[in-house]
Swiss-Prot record:
Alphabetized InterPro entries for the sequence: C2_dom, C2_domain_sf, CAR1-11
Protein's name according to its UniProt entry: Protein C2-DOMAIN ABA-RELATED 11
Subunit note: Binds to PYR/PYL/RCAR abscisic acid intracellular receptors in an ABA-independent manner, both at the plasma membrane and in the nucleus.
Annotated GO MF terms: GTPase activator activity; metal ion binding; phospholipid binding
Binding site for Ca(2+) 1: R21, D22, D73, D75, D81
Amino acid sequence: MGEPLGLLQVTVIQGKKLVIRDFKSSDPYVIVKLGNESAKTKVINNCLNPVWNEELNFTLKDPAAVLALEVFDKDRFKADDKMGHASLSLQPLISVARLRHVVRVSSGETTLRKVLPDPENCVSRESTISCIDGEVVQSVWLRLCAVESGEIELKIKLIDPPGTNK
């Protein structure tokens, strides 16, 4: 776990069918964690289907890393309410990044792997991992756990560390 495997660029795109935690709605935000790093989106007031389109950056060091996210409802006078959590193994993304170097995919868009929903993961819809003009990108919807409903859409891009030959 010494040298970085790359920069992980996580775009929190949107949420769908989030749970109500205030009187009629919620004020959601997302905290994304990778190892001991964490980052937070802005709060979207009074919305159960928020659109963030926020890019959060992390240093990927562990090939067995798991991306974790928690969704909260911002409250003014008391502790923020939990609106669910989800996690995503980054092993498929990392293996595709390694494969890309072996098969020398560099231009255009090529789907190299699919991740299917199953009881062992939080993936809610079929997810694709593609090589787009030399960059490895995963588009994924995650089902929120420990709540009645809710999904979060992410776009995850693994960027090679500086000095790496593509």
